[in-house]
Amino acid sequence: MSEPLHALAKQLEQAIRASEPFQQLKRAYEDVRRDETAYRMFANVRDIQLQLHEKQMRGAAILPDEIEQAQKAMALAQQNEKLARLMALEQQMSMTIAEVQQIAMKPLEELHRSFMEGR
């Protein structure tokens, strides 16, 4: 990565870490960690998601009962106030990161578009 872009990426990382949405997410993780029930439910959902992701990466079929198990675990987790808050904050942070990525990719997208229009 060129030095100026690398420096800007580091500044962006620091800005994300210092942002209020990230700090809220960090506090939500700490709240879940301190609550044994919420932490166990979080770990269960994470484990199920990882197992399904691994199967998907291997090209293995995900069975309907596995999907149902994941949906039930997620529904149960969403009933926990701390986990529901954590998931909502994660979603917001993911959307923010996606918007930043979209902005960063704009020059490349414009280059591709102008290249294809030039034919």
From Swiss-Prot:
Cystine pairs: none
Annotated SUPFAM superfamilies: YheA/YmcA-like
InterPro entries for the chain: Com_YlbF, YheA/YmcA-like_dom_sf
Organism domain of life: Bacteria
Family note: Belongs to the UPF0342 family.
Protein name: UPF0342 protein GK0640
Organism: Geobacillus kaustophilus (strain HTA426)
